[in-house]
Amino acid sequence: MNTPSFPPLFSGLAVEGQVDPFDKACAEAARGCDAGLVVHDLGANLLRAALVFAPDVELVDAMAMLPLCGVGFQNALGALGPPEVAVHLEWAGGLRINGASCGTLRVAASSSNPKAEPDWMVIGLELPLWPETDTPGDIPEQTALYAEGCADVNAMELLESWVKHTLVGINTWTEDGVKTLHKDWRGLSHGIGENITMNEISGTFLGVDEQFGMLIRAADTTHLVPLTYLLEGT
């Protein structure tokens, strides 16, 4: 069986069955594994993977890894898939392919204190490859990668490409800050200008602040939902 090949400083850990790569990555990170661990499960119908990071900035700034990994996914699929396939990113981590929901990104960290430097952070990817039913049109708002003209995209190559393009994004973020990431993410963002409810706040999704917090204009004022709201398990 072939195994994925990753850039230097990244290492792979394959799991299968009932083991969730995201949970496994969090457990390994809590035990002190090196940053760059890629836990993955290349299932027949579902691609699941998780990256372990060791941020050296405050959590509120490190949360940029979530949109950064989203941009990395778009770049990865853009390099391997047909040019007409469109990828968009939801603020909360959801992925959209050709307008329909297709997988998600997740995030966890060792701490939920926005001003603390976390010991570790994990970003997880879940991507359906094939529809769950034989009649995918029954749920038009949901899709799968291979139902959107990407049947020639190899899941392992997509995983490798995601890690590679995410690394490029990390290097740019480290050298230049969030300016380029903001530009790239906004060009791929889904839902700006639309009505939304997040953290029990309803209003118009105006965009994001410097640290990718969601700005929602309600009747009374503009509310900010920090990206740390999306942290799991804290």
What are these regions (language model features)?
Residues 1-34, 58-64, 68-82, 101-234:
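Long, positively charged amphipathic alpha-helical accessory segments at protein N-termini or as interdomain linkers
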